[in-house]
């Protein structure tokens, strides 16, 4: 089967990009043909509070080749993205969704592609933890363009069904990230100069 993935992916950093790299890799391992369609601009600099949006030297990243075509704030690129994906002629288009900021581009692509292939949205977060007035209607706009959904938690499933009661979805647990290297024991870790033996690590559930 031929898959297209529309998502931030390498050289972007962050959980969504890494997840999409894992998804790409696993689909290829299963014998599928896969092509990644990436953002050429994810966030405008004025809206990005961090140091960089990109992988830096020393970061562990899954390096995936991609077509960098979608600009989140340039509507002209929405048409270019549709053309690029249509020329690839996928059987399935998977869209990574986690924030309503990207709905204008995503919804345009989904609407234009749904007559040509199955459009599946992989939802990392349907509604933000602190929603703004436009988050729900924008998410609904995108979801109504899709044939089906993948969710990875009960909370996201609940939000999806609330926003789009007729949604067809499957639910699978969020996989563990596997690109950080092999597990090592405590004593070996403590021999690392950057790790203090007396230090303690507090694990918290942030909902991310």
Summary of predicted features, one role per range:
Residues 7-21, 44, 98-103:
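A short, glycine/small-residue-rich beta-strand->loop->alpha-helix junction that serves as a flexible
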Residues 42, 156, 172-182, 204-208:
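Short beta-strand->alpha-helix junction loop in the catalytic core
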């Amino acid at each position: 089967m031929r898959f297209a993935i529309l998502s931030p992916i390498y050289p972007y950093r962050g959980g969504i990009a890494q997840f999409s790299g894992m998804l790409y890799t696993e689909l290829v391992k299963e014998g599928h043909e896969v092509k990644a369609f990436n953002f050429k601009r994810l966030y405008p600099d004025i809206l990005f509070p961090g140091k960089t949006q990109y992988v830096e030297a020393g970061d562990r990243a899954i390096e995936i080749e991609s077509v960098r075509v979608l600009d989140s704030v340039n509507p002209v690129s929405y048409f270019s993205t549709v053309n690029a994906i249509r020329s690839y002629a996928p059987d399935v288009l998977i869209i990574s969704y986690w924030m309503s900021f990207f709905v204008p581009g995503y919804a345009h692509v989904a609407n234009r592609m749904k007559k040509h292939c199955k459009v599946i949205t992989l939802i990392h977060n349907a509604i933000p933890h602190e929603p703004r007035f436009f988050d729900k209607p924008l998410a609904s706009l995108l979801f109504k363009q899709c044939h089906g959904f993948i969710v990875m938690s009960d909370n996201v499933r609940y939000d999806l069904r609330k926003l789009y009661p007729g949604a067809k979805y499957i639910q699978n647990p969020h996989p563990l990230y596997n690109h950080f290297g092999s597990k090592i024991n405590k004593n070996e870790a403590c021999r690392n100069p950057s790790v203090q033996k007396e230090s303690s690590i507090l694990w918290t559930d942030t909902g991310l």
